[in-house]
């Protein structure tokens, strides 16, 4: 535990996981070649609400890219091919949002679309391309002064292509829904959620269909101005419906098949004005981690 990655035997690769056993280090070897680096960011925002008679609409378009390679061109940045030999890395991300609200902030609805392509060419054995797209809607409606009803639905596609290890190639697509009720009191905050989703796709030549349903509670209790304690409890049950015993890590939001239980608690408290204490206790139980406990704490002194 407490690493950055875990090894997936089915895919023959390391998967990013905050509970994994492996820590990643970068060790340069071999000859060094001259690379051209280019980074860029574009942000466009049009807020109709600032006009005198404008509607309650705000539109955002964001783009950022990061490129390294011996050759720079439009196609290398926007649409790199898997067989490219002149690219070290090419990452592109686009985000579009349309935000609809009301003047009294009693409701809000947001439509969003995001897509990214991450070309990774720093493995001497070959290249990989990680593609991702997500389109959805979320928002909230005020029920009372201290309570809101929140919702989100989205459809996503995740695609991994590799030209040197066939087992790594996989594709996942599906949709997820979540509805939440939030209650905000003077000394506490609470949120109750129900979520459901279905993912399907393939791993190399094997197809799968998986579904999951779960509940979540997130709460925070304040001790005046001295500190607070937070609790997050997540319980879900996931099933594979096509008699395939394995699902890729991109499916079911990274959870495993079967029952998944996750509990996270954290405490922050000021003992004195210049001394504070923080502690977190985490518990995880699923097919991948059996009754995993992690405890961390620290004292801080402020000069």
Where would I find each of the regions flagged by the language model?
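Exposed, low-structure sequence patches enriched in small/polar residues
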Residues: 1-303
